[in-house]
């Protein structure tokens, strides 16, 4: 007897998780505000081991956070394959005008003005999983 459509998640190394994260262009910034989880769509780039994220969130909401979480994934629902990576670490809002201008030129954004924020996350915890078809069960 063969079971079709079974998938399994396998944890990957931190190095592979960072490689997967580097291959993605968008994800979600996650933080807590008023005791509620907040998720914002975001784009990112991994530079010198730091994650630079552009997100439509107010800088004031993020600057009070000492740690932020970023999650990205690529899932092929029909094929039952893909991956997910979560990175958490200390973070700061990018305030240097030249650095901010550089990332605003290179990272596409959805919002402008007070809801267009750049943050740098120093990943300390990186966890990744691959989703794959399980071998046939007999």
Where in this protein do the model-derived segments appear?
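General beta-strand recognition
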Residues: 50-52, 120, 127
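Extreme N-terminal tail/first-helix region
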Residues: 1-21
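Short helix/loop capping segments that flank catalytic or ligand/cofactor-binding pockets
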Residues: 129-131
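Short, structured beta-strand-loop surface elements
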Residues: 56-117, 123
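Short, surface-exposed beta-strand-loop junctions and turns on beta-sheet-rich folds
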Residues: 35, 59-61, 135
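Short beta-strand segments
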Residues: 24-56
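A short, compositionally biased
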Residues: 22-26, 64-65
């Amino acid at each position: 007897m063969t079971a079709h459509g079974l998938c399994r998640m396998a944890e990957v190394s931190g190095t592979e998780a960072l490689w997967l994260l580097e291959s993605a262009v968008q994800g979600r910034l996650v933080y807590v505000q008023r005791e509620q989880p907040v998720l914002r769509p975001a784009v990112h780039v991994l530079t010198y081991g730091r994650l630079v994220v552009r997100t439509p969130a107010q800088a004031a909401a993020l600057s009070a956070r000492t740690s932020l979480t970023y999650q990205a994934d690529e899932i092929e629902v029909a094929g039952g394959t893909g991956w997910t990576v979560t990175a958490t670490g200390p973070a700061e809002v990018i305030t240097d005008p030249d650095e901010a201008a550089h990332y605003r030129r290179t990272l596409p954004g959805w919002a402008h003005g007070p809801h267009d924020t750049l943050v740098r996350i120093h990943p300390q915890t990186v966890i990744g999983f691959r989703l794959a078809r399980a071998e046939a069960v007999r």
